[in-house]
């Protein structure tokens, strides 16, 4: 234990994937960031609500690396702790457009870094929206595109973001080299793109996956003759 350190818990639903909250990982993280003491729930109890409650009651900040429903449950537990409730950083989609949450995108506006620092609850931006918002919001704020502009956001991602089954399909050669998905135009990132992009019209979002493990390309085509300024 580091005297005076900020105590941080990481809650994950799996010990596999992009983040594995093993004991060695916790020790490495604590040593890598002076002043931060990282805690987690033992792997065999990682889905136990009481174990999650116990660790959240001991820390200053909790990072949620959970599916949406599990993240909502974890926030309910945190809220029930009253004065012992930690600050929450949620990496899921569950709270990105929810009232009472601050969007963790410091470049969004001049006041966003201060809002994040002061917030008790911060929602981590999604991967696709980070690219889309970074492209669109400055143009909206500067008045170059109207808030009701009919935006189309195209994005290509590597396959590692699709989870275990997608990774296996691409790496064993059974997946197509390129695949468009979300063709019902109801992708879970659309509300986030619209709200923090600063637009009033629902964007058309066209996500796709390419045959490469990591990386992302996001583009937003615009008609030059419709731009202001």
Where do the language-model regions lie?
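Generic low-complexity segments that are intrinsically disordered, proline-rich and/or Lys/Arg-biased
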Residues: 3-4, 22, 35, 50, ...
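Short Gly/charged-rich anion-binding patches and loops
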Residues: 25, 51, 73, 188, ...
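General secondary-structure edge motif
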Residues: 7-10, 119, 173-174, 200
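Low-acidity, Ser/Thr- and Arg-rich intrinsically disordered low-complexity segments
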Residues: 1, 6-8, 13-30
């Amino acid at each position: 234990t580091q005297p005076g350190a900020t105590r941080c818990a990481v809650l994950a639903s799996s010990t596999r994937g992009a983040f594995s909250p093993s004991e060695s990982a916790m020790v490495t993280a604590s040593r890598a960031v002076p002043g931060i003491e990282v805690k987690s729930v033992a792997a065999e109890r990682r889905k136990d609500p009481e174990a999650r409650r116990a660790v959240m009651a001991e820390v200053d900040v909790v990072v949620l690396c959970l599916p949406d429903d599990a993240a909502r449950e974890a926030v309910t537990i945190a809220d029930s702790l009253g004065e012992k409730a930690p600050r929450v950083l949620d990496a899921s989609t569950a709270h990105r457009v929810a009232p009472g949450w601050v969007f963790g995108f410091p470049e969004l506006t001049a006041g966003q870094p201060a809002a994040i620092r002061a917030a008790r609850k911060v929602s981590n931006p999604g991967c696709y929206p980070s690219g889309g918002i970074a492209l669109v919001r400055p143009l909206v704020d500067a008045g170059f595109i109207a808030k009701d502009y009919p935006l189309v956001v195209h994005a290509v991602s590597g396959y590692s973001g699709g989870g275990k089954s997608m990774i296996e399909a691409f790496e064993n050669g059974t997946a197509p080299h390129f695949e468009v998905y979300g063709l019902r135009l109801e992708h879970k990132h659309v509300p986030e793109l619209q709200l923090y992009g600063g637009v009033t019209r629902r964007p058309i979002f066209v996500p796709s996956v390419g045959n490469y493990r990591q990386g992302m390309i996001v583009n937003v085509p615009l008609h030059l003759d419709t731009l202001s300024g």
